[in-house]
Amino acid sequence: MSGNTLGTLFTVTTFGESHGPAIGCVIDGCPPGMALTEADVQLELDRRKPGTSRHVTQRQEPDQVEILSGVFEGVTTGAPIALLIRNTDQRSKDYGNIAETFRPGHADYTYWQKYGVRDYRGGGRSSARLTAPVVGAGAIAKKWLCERFGVEVRGYMSALGEIEIPFVDWSHVRENPFFAPNADIVPQLEDYMDALRKDGDSIGARIDVVASGVPVGWGEPLFDRLDADIAHAMMGINAVKGVEIGAGFASVAQRGSVHGDELTPDGFVGNHAGGVLGGISTGQDITVSIAIKPTSSIRTPRRSITRAGEPAVVETFGRHDPCVGIRATPIAESMLALVLIDHALRHRAQCGDVSSATPRIAARAPDAQ
């Protein structure tokens, strides 16, 4: 299995399985000299951890992080940083009924066909449990980006199933378990999830992520374009089936006179590009949306096959998120932060001394609509 590392200069390699003794990651390329404690990382992990409301999996994992290396006297040394998160609430017996079958919509079938062996307990390596170390690494990336460039990476849920969530204010996001930017809609979301759980079914979600303060110039054309790497990273999140940057698929119906963001001496007039042109950051907000599919582990009986190819019916009774999108916001934020820190370091390596006589215009003109 060779696809476990993300990044070029700032790299993250994850390890572990859902029901193994521990999960974690090794981060290489973190700049030295940044103050870092386990509390800095734990703050982000607590936003993602399971068991925080009745609407997510009831698996009770504290997700307590241990920093094993790369930090001395509270400061990063430039050496690899190893993060370890111990699994403490595995319940492998819940998965005995799927040891010989494949869950529809899950990686069970493809892992078996590719590797000839499969850890069926909680999905093993394919489990969303492996997003915890990604969030741990993302916490480090966020901290460095904020301290070095003033970059802020934030996200929110913009849709739960067919329910659109109008954006009201960022302050609402941290006040509810859905990461919804609209407190008034939370009771509707709760009722929706309660009904879904009673039905033994699941649903998808859309998550929006915004990075503010990114300087102009990050990105490596042609094939390591900033937006290409963002899409690559976002598709590496479990259950993500679609990525939009800026106007995304709505660009199909926009005319060039609308989609092209005009430039004025006072700044850009729009941001349909999502903060990226030609694979390089414009200095505007980088805006990303991801589509998350419904959880495949559900109680509703579904047709499948056994390992011998015989017909079977699959019902899953473990502790699962009826909507994995509810806890996906900090994961998507982390993925974006990991791409940004990697490109910040790559830009510094090649173009750190480049200067231009053209002024850097504001991300948004005062009269922009």
Swiss-Prot record:
Subunit organization: Homotetramer.
Family per record: Belongs to the chorismate synthase family.
GO MF, any single term: FMN binding
EC number: 4.2.3.5
Cofactor: FMNH2
Residues the entry annotates as binding NADP(+): R48, R54
Record pathway: Metabolic intermediate biosynthesis; chorismate biosynthesis; chorismate from D-erythrose 4-phosphate and phosphoenolpyruvate: step 7/7
Enzymatic reactions: 5-O-(1-carboxyvinyl)-3-phosphoshikimate = chorismate + phosphate
Gene: aroC
GO terms under biological process: amino acid biosynthetic process; aromatic amino acid family biosynthetic process; chorismate biosynthetic process
Function: This reaction introduces a second double bond into the aromatic ring system.
Binding of FMN, residues: R125, S126, S127, N238, A239, G278, K293, P294, T295, S296, S297, R319
Family annotation (InterPro entries): Chorismate_synth, Chorismate_synth_AroC_sf, Chorismate_synthase_CS
Domain of life, per lineage: Bacteria
Keyword vocabulary terms for this entry: Amino-acid biosynthesis, Aromatic amino acid biosynthesis, FAD, Flavoprotein, FMN, Lyase, NADP
Protein name: Chorismate synthase
GO CC annotations, alphabetized: cytosol
Co-factor binding comment: Reduced FMN (FMNH(2)).
Pfam family, any one: Chorismate_synt
